[in-house]
Amino acid sequence: MDWGTELWDQFEVLERHTQWGLDLLDKYVKFVKERVEVEQSYAKQLRSLVKKYLPKRPAKDDPEIKFSQQQSFVQLLQEVNDFAGQRELVAESLGIRVCLELAKYSQEMKQERKMHFQEGRRAQQQLENGFKQLENSKRKFERDCREAEKAAHTAERLDQDINATKADVEKAKQQAHLRNHMAEESKNEYAAQLQRFNRDQAHFYFSQMPQIFDKLQDMDERRATRLGAGYGLLSEAELQVVPIIGKCLEGMKVAAESVDAKNDSKVLIELHKSGFARPGDLEFEDFSQVMNRVPSDSSLGTPDGRPELRAASSRSRAKRWPFGKKNKTVVTEDFSHLPPEQQRKRLQQQLEERNRELQKEEDQREALKKMKDVYEKTPQMGDPASLEPRIAETLGNIERLKLEVQKYEAWLAEAESRVLSNRGDSLSRHTRPPDPPTTAPPDSSSSSNNSGSQDNKESSEEPPSEEGQDTPIYTEFDEDFEEPASPIGQCVAIYHFEGSSEGTVSMSEGEDLSLMEEDKGDGWTRVRRKQGGEGYVPTSYLRVTLN
């Protein structure tokens, strides 16, 4: 698929898309520049940190260097310093290979894009100029024809006038002949201009603009490929320093393992052993005459409980009223504001995302079940009851995700049927609509009342729910509202219908409708419009899909 064939009439769309692609390229270059600044700042801060904590005295004058802990710390700082050097290499590599090269490439792409669109606009201007010339020749031809007709009428009138002189009649005939000749020349000029414009228009739509669009497509694909390679440079810059960073990390590990606590104790003994004898016992001194008053228990303060009250109040504030007002996003949740093909793609993405989340939750549920079995068999490893809240939460998530999957599957099926119906519409777009049925449509109000009474009858026959059974929380609210009749299918209007007679409803070509009642053999079908309104339309004007 190429732009020149599929997007032949989307000049502005291609202009915006190619501009967006270049903006994305510039955005990535800017991101890498800031990433380079972060890496440079990170390396600089690491080096400053190492310099701050390195011993200030030489090793021979520093007694602490004899401890393995200090030696390991110094070695650790040196490895961090080497690590900072590798971050500087990453920043340098990204600055050269991404910032400089991609910025230069972006400028080249902008110049190429500008050239292609200038060429396209010139072609459009030439076609518009040709159309203006065609209109001028057409108006001239029309004007000359009127003048020729007027001159012919004048000559005929003078020829029949007995009071007119022969010279006047002859002059009028010559004038009529001249006007007729001028009209013939204008006709030939108009025909030539029309032929030239049709040739230029065919060349414009079938050759010139498709070539320009194909060039734009090639340019955009090259830009996207180069941008993808630029994305990969981030990981390549990291992979280049991974071996050295691995050695730095290995050095840190060796430094950590080289700490010898026993030897450090011996070093401390050797450095600070005094050699003095331990002091002897002290003699008893009696001070029993001095009695210290023991403070009473009543002097001790007790907490007033206010923190607990505050905690309780904060917990109460943390609760949310379940019937609070929520932002309604139902209108755009099914992406119905998008074109059918775009809606299908977005719904497909949402469905795949929900399936991945569902699979993740199911895997987590299986893992929790296995862990619970292990706890039940080996109680000392853990309490099986402690896993119940997590298992219940996982089951709730699974049920919620299953409902969402079903919802998106239904929307996706509807969107796919709409896409297929729209494709079929393109084949029958310009065909003549069939004649509507000669019989009058049924009475829509009586049909609605019948269906409503039937629904009420069915609802009255439902048995009441027993105690102990699961009942929806909001049942009492649902009972206050009578649900409208559910559609039995979907349909698309193939032709435009005015709906001027009683009981009918108007519809536009390509409009999506809900099927409320099938054709009873009289040629009429009852439908409901998305924006409201219900009535009958000719069955032959619809493409129907039953649920």
Swiss-Prot record:
Residues 293-547 are annotated as: Interaction with PDE6G. Residues 1-264 form the F-BAR domain. Gene3D superfamilies: 6.10.140.470, Arfaptin homology (AH) domain/BAR domain, SH3 Domains. Residues 431-487 are annotated as: Interaction with DNM2 and WASL. Residues 490-547 are annotated as: Interaction with WAS. The keyword Coiled coil applies. GO terms for cellular component: cell cortex; cell projection; cytoskeleton; Golgi apparatus; lysosome; phagocytic cup. Residues 67-259, 332-425 form a coiled coil. Residues 415-547 are annotated as: Required for interaction with FASLG and localization to lysosomes. The modification Phosphoserine is found at residues 296, 298-299, 426. Residues 294-323, 420-485 are annotated as: Disordered. Residues 293-483 are annotated as: Interaction with CDC42. Residues 337-414 form the REM-1 domain. It is found in: Cytoplasm, Cytoskeleton; Cytoplasm, Cell cortex; Lysosome; Golgi apparatus. SMART domains: FCH, SH3. Keywords: Cell membrane, Cell projection, Coiled coil, Cytoplasm, Cytoskeleton, Endocytosis, Golgi apparatus, Lipid-binding, Lysosome, Membrane, Phosphoprotein, SH3 domain. Belongs to the FNBP1 family. Required to coordinate membrane tubulation with reorganization of the actin cytoskeleton during endocytosis. Also acts as a link between CDC42 signaling and regulation of the actin cytoskeleton. Binds to lipids such as phosphatidylinositol 4,5-bisphosphate and phosphatidylserine and promotes membrane invagination and the formation of tubules. Also enhances actin polymerization in the vicinity of membrane tubules by recruiting WASL/N-WASP which in turn activates the Arp2/3 complex. Actin polymerization and dynamin may promote the fission of membrane tubules to form endocytic vesicles. Homodimerizes, the dimers can polymerize end-to-end to form filamentous structures. Interacts specifically with GTP-bound CDC42 and RHOQ. Interacts with AKAP9, ARHGAP17, DAAM1, DIAPH1, DIAPH2, DNM1, DNM2, FASLG/FASL, GAPVD1, LYN, microtubules, SRC, WAS/WASP and WASL/N-WASP. Interacts with the ligand binding domain of the thyroid receptor (TR) in the presence of thyroid hormone. May interact with CTNNB1 and HD/HTT. Interacts with PDE6G. This is Cdc42-interacting protein 4. The lineage of its organism: Eukaryota, Metazoa, Chordata, Craniata, Vertebrata. The gene is Trip10.
